[in-house]
Structures are given as structure tokens and as C-alpha cells.
């Protein structure tokens, strides 16, 4: 006996726990693997649940290989879809009377179990058996019927026990009526509920006595569909049921809407304030007072209208307000009445009741999902289109406000030129670069100043450039032009010449004062300074004094052969050429002419004048200030090639390497290396052959080179001598 003994372990609240678990998973969006979308909104669900409750979804999801498909349903109202999903997960749903017809049509299309004609036909035999038991039992206690009921297992997740026991509660104390024929499968469950609401007053006491028996019936036979609610609801103690059956005996192909006469009114009528204030006590026309669909009765059989009194009028009294639609939460919330905990079966747990509660204490409602806020806010009427998230006025990315720049003041911009003119100064960098702070202004030149000084013993020289053609002498005429003027009132051109003279070690002031505008063939150097008219006289006097000082300084430099360096009056360290290694006067004139051009360029760049160097064979225009004023006044232009250089040192180096390049390549006479320029050769010797004595050149070779190109040969010798003296 011990070997054959087995124990049966039963989970009493298994069905309610399973359904509650699925509800909680969907509310938390856990393990959801399918999305239903319509009208631009979506609902997430589980494939297993949809497939178990709808053959349509079962076939569709079988043929879909996607892990998380999105099913777009055309011509389906979102509220109907939301109600269907809630029905699938909960087994019941509260639907407004005006939405009932479209809801049933959507359920028919999606073939939801419990809401279709096929489901009613499958359960017709069970309903007939229940009716026979009810007719033969008379006033027999209902728990006997519960024990004899079959238990089909066709997998329907909805719980229609409340619907099945709806009419038995109300007619328990009534006299037994005549025999009722078998109900056709197309009986509308909503019609039966509505008619039962009309007789709820007489059935309240009897339903209270048998409430526990009905709960047991509901727990043992959860799989009965909604359309089969007539079975347990056909308690023949109700005197008005035969007319109902005769009234609905004619077959109907589509679910009918059994609302009152005013159900054809506008469906978009907003809900009344009184109906909002009443809360989720019932949706009026359908008579579903709580989430279990038990008509106007809660779990213990007490009518909601009896409990609430005048707060919730009966459906007959509210016939004039049938066109008014309740809030969406009135249709979906179930447990906001006073005895919400009593509406579940005895097998239900407290956790299950808390999860199904939709009160304001934070518990999850039976229809709680990610779209509840959209349903409550965007659906004032059932068929209204979803509202815009933002109004057109709020949908602008930027406001029509002007952008202000407080740091830019037009008056300050207008006065910038004058301020810079007053605050500029002339500075000489340690590398010999002349830097100025100048602005561009337009000045009308009316006069040209020609400085003539014939007291220089070096007034004649021979200088030509291979890149310039022979032109006649030119004297600049008074024109209106744009030049760069210094911001200081002191003349700067003699200072620039003095600076250049200190850098080169030569007296360049002789070329600035040599010649006249009609110089002729004597090779005089004509310089015309274009200055403002108010400074011309002061410039002329200062230039004369500077020229005399430079002549005396040159004589002192030539007489002092022992000193390698001396300090100039302008504060620039100048390198003087040793007397012993000084070449002929012709070579010095050639080199001085080049440096005079560089000095004139620096002087004109600093904004003091527009200088022109003219002789019989070439014209050297060094008016760098005119053409370079737009670049900031820091460029030094080489006129033969029109190249701008940033400093005077670079301009000098450029003239030496490019325009004074000898015909023979610069070759180191010690290591015989060939370089691209004299500057590179000089750097090479200063690094590698600094301590070596320079070898003497052959006289014949030097004479040949001098005869071929005396200027370049002498310049090359000058570079070598300068390097030797510095080393």
C-alpha cells in the first residue's frame, strides 16, 4: 500500500496567480517580445499570451522569424486594441456602450477567444448542460451545480466566472419560471448584463447569501467564455428572462448594440463634470460597476447603486445622459469601490488584489501600462484623434529675438582710426626689424619735397640691376593716394636710415640727400618724401641735421679701424667694417646703394614717406608703404622681384642671395662644397672652418672675375672679408 500511495498537491489560486504574473510582467515590460501598433501608438505584449488567446496572432507569429516583431493594425481604433489586450491578460474589461460595437468587431477580426462566434459555438454544449441543471434544481443551493459542472481545458485565459454567475445571484429568491429553451450561440453577453441590471434590487439579498458558492464556481470553471455567460446566468427564477430569450432568438451576423434610444448621438461629446466626480463606479450604460463584470454587484452581492445612493444614478435614471462618455479610467479601473477586496475569489491572495487595484496609492491597475497616461490625457472622446504634443506656437526652435553684440559699438569703431593714430609708436627690434604701429589714412599730396645736398664726396656711383630695364628719370607728381602714416608726430625716415646705417655699417644718408629731380647723367639719387603738409618743414630741417651727423659718423668709422663694434646714437648695436679690409670706394658705393634701397623700403613701410631711387640706368622704387599698407605695415618689398619680406634683415639677405648672386656658384674654397647661396656658404664657414685661415686667392683668377663682372666679384669678396673679420 505504501508503494502505491500518491499525494495530490494542488495550487488553489493557480489560475489567478498565473494571470496576475502575466499582468505584472506586461506592466513592467519584462520579457515582452511583440508590439501592437495602430493610430501612431503602440502596446507591448507577450507572444505566448497573444497566441494562446487568439488564433489570428498564433498563425501570424508562427510565420514571423523576428525576435521582436511590430504588428501594425490598419483601421483599428487604439482604444479597442487596448481594451482587447486588457481582456486577454485579465479575462475581463469594462467597455463603454458607445465603443462596444467597434470593440466586438475588432475582436471578431482578431479572433480573440471568448469574444467571437466560434467560441460561443464551442461552448454551446456546456451552456445547455448548465441550463438543464438550473431548471431541474429549482431552489437547490448553487454549490451542487458547481460540483457537477464540467471543466473544459481549452486554454482561454479570461475569467468569466463572474459573468456566468451574474444572473444566478439576482434570481435566487424568485419563483421558478417555466422551462427555458437552449440559448443560441449568438446571445450578446452585454444585453444579458444590461437586462440583469434592471432586476438587481430584487436579487441583492439572495445574491449575498450565495456569494461564496459563486466564488467557488468561478474559481473552478474559469475557462467559460463571455459569450457563454447565459449558462450560469440563466437562473430561471427571474420572471423577465423568457421575453429576453424570445427577443434575441433571431440570428445576428454581427454583434448588436443594445444601448438606449440616444446611443446615436455624437460620440465625441465630452464627459460631464458630475460623471468625472463620481469616479470609477460604473460606466453607466453597460452597467459594469466593477472590474469583474458582475453588473452592479460587487463580490459580496451588494449593489453598487445601493451602496453609493444618489452619487451613481441607475441606468434608467441616466437614460438622458447616454450620449455622455465617461473618462477612460472610468472604463478601465476596477477596484476603486469601498469593498474592492471582496470582489475576487477566495483563492486570490492579497498580492493579487493589490496588483489589480487601481487606486491612488501607487498600486498597479488592471490596465496599467506604458500608455495609460496617453489614454487618460489624449482621449477626451473615444474616437478623437490624438492631440499634438506641442502646439504650433511652441514648436519653434528659436524665438524671434534679435542677436545682440554688446561688445561692438559703432561709435567705438568710428573712433578707432583716430585712437590708433594717437597711440602708435615706432620701435626697432633687437634683430634690426623695424616695427611700426600705423593706420591707413587718405591724404591729398599737394607738394613734393626734394632735398638736394652736394656736400657729399660720394655723390657719383655706378649701379644697375639686371632685372630692371633702363628708364628715364621720373619725378613723382602730386597725386591723391592711400599711404601708411605713422601715429607719432616726429619724422621717422631719418631714424630708419640711421638704423639701417647702423646695421650695415655704412653711411646711407648720402643717398637720401644726393641728386635732384633733374639729375641727368651724373647718377644723382633723387628722393622725394611724401609727407603731410603740416610736417614738411619740420621734416626738411631734421633731415638736413641728420645727414650732417651721418657724414661725420662715417668719417669716424673709417678712421677707427681697431674697434670691431661701436654703439650708435640711436641705441642699435652696429657692426663697422674694418679699415684694413675695406674694398675700393666703388664696391662700397654698390653695396651702399642696395642697403639704401632697403633702408628706404623700411622707412616708407614705417609710414614716413614714399621714396624713389632714380639713376640713369635703372629706377628702384621702394615705396613699400603704398602697396603694403593693407598688410599691417610690417612688410619690406624688394622692387626687382616684388617680394614682400617681414624684416629688414631678411630683405638684405634676400638681395644678397638673389639679386647679387655671382655667376659662379658659391663653393667653399676649403672643402670644395657647393651651396645655393652666399648666406649658406657663410654659415658653413662660420661653423666648420671658423678657426682655419682663409687661403689666398690667385691674382689672375680675381682679375678675370673682376673683368667679367666686377660688381658681383667685389660683392663676393666683401662677403668673404666680412666673414673673415667676424671670425
From Swiss-Prot:
<dbReference type="GO" id="GO:0045944">
    <property type="term" value="P:positive regulation of transcription by RNA polymerase II"/>
</dbReference>
<feature type="compositionally biased region" description="Low complexity">
    <location>
        <begin position="533"/>
        <end position="568"/>
    </location>
</feature>
<dbReference type="GO" id="GO:0001752">
    <property type="term" value="P:compound eye photoreceptor fate commitment"/>
</dbReference>
<feature type="zinc finger region" description="C2H2-type 2">
    <location>
        <begin position="666"/>
        <end position="689"/>
    </location>
</feature>
<dbReference type="GO" id="GO:0048808">
    <property type="term" value="P:male genitalia morphogenesis"/>
</dbReference>
<comment type="function">
    <text>Broad-complex proteins are required for puffing and transcription of salivary gland late genes during metamorphosis.</text>
</comment>
<dbReference type="GO" id="GO:0005634">
    <property type="term" value="C:nucleus"/>
</dbReference>
<feature type="compositionally biased region" description="Low complexity">
    <location>
        <begin position="445"/>
        <end position="460"/>
    </location>
</feature>
<keyword id="KW-0539">Nucleus</keyword>
<dbReference type="GO" id="GO:0035075">
    <property type="term" value="P:response to ecdysone"/>
</dbReference>
<dbReference type="GO" id="GO:0006357">
    <property type="term" value="P:regulation of transcription by RNA polymerase II"/>
</dbReference>
<dbReference type="GO" id="GO:0042332">
    <property type="term" value="P:gravitaxis"/>
</dbReference>
<dbReference type="GO" id="GO:0040034">
    <property type="term" value="P:regulation of development, heterochronic"/>
</dbReference>
<feature type="region of interest" description="Disordered">
    <location>
        <begin position="532"/>
        <end position="583"/>
    </location>
</feature>
<feature type="compositionally biased region" description="Low complexity">
    <location>
        <begin position="713"/>
        <end position="727"/>
    </location>
</feature>
<dbReference type="GO" id="GO:0006914">
    <property type="term" value="P:autophagy"/>
</dbReference>
<dbReference type="InterPro" id="IPR000210">
    <property type="entry name" value="BTB/POZ_dom"/>
</dbReference>
<keyword id="KW-0217">Developmental protein</keyword>
<dbReference type="Pfam" id="PF00651">
    <property type="entry name" value="BTB"/>
</dbReference>
<dbReference type="GO" id="GO:0048477">
    <property type="term" value="P:oogenesis"/>
</dbReference>
<dbReference type="GO" id="GO:0030707">
    <property type="term" value="P:follicle cell of egg chamber development"/>
</dbReference>
<dbReference type="InterPro" id="IPR051095">
    <property type="entry name" value="Dros_DevTransReg"/>
</dbReference>
<feature type="region of interest" description="Disordered">
    <location>
        <begin position="135"/>
        <end position="185"/>
    </location>
</feature>
<dbReference type="GO" id="GO:0007458">
    <property type="term" value="P:progression of morphogenetic furrow involved in compound eye morphogenesis"/>
</dbReference>
<dbReference type="GO" id="GO:0000977">
    <property type="term" value="F:RNA polymerase II transcription regulatory region sequence-specific DNA binding"/>
</dbReference>
<feature type="region of interest" description="Disordered">
    <location>
        <begin position="694"/>
        <end position="727"/>
    </location>
</feature>
<keyword id="KW-0238">DNA-binding</keyword>
<dbReference type="GO" id="GO:0003677">
    <property type="term" value="F:DNA binding"/>
</dbReference>
<dbReference type="GO" id="GO:0055001">
    <property type="term" value="P:muscle cell development"/>
</dbReference>
<dbReference type="GO" id="GO:0010629">
    <property type="term" value="P:negative regulation of gene expression"/>
</dbReference>
<feature type="compositionally biased region" description="Low complexity">
    <location>
        <begin position="475"/>
        <end position="495"/>
    </location>
</feature>
<dbReference type="Pfam" id="PF13912">
    <property type="entry name" value="zf-C2H2_6"/>
</dbReference>
<dbReference type="InterPro" id="IPR036236">
    <property type="entry name" value="Znf_C2H2_sf"/>
</dbReference>
<feature type="zinc finger region" description="C2H2-type 1">
    <location>
        <begin position="636"/>
        <end position="659"/>
    </location>
</feature>
<keyword id="KW-0677">Repeat</keyword>
<keyword id="KW-0862">Zinc</keyword>
<feature type="region of interest" description="Disordered">
    <location>
        <begin position="445"/>
        <end position="496"/>
    </location>
</feature>
<dbReference type="GO" id="GO:0009608">
    <property type="term" value="P:response to symbiont"/>
</dbReference>
<dbReference type="InterPro" id="IPR011333">
    <property type="entry name" value="SKP1/BTB/POZ_sf"/>
</dbReference>
<dbReference type="GO" id="GO:0048813">
    <property type="term" value="P:dendrite morphogenesis"/>
</dbReference>
<feature type="compositionally biased region" description="Low complexity">
    <location>
        <begin position="227"/>
        <end position="238"/>
    </location>
</feature>
<dbReference type="GO" id="GO:0071390">
    <property type="term" value="P:cellular response to ecdysone"/>
</dbReference>
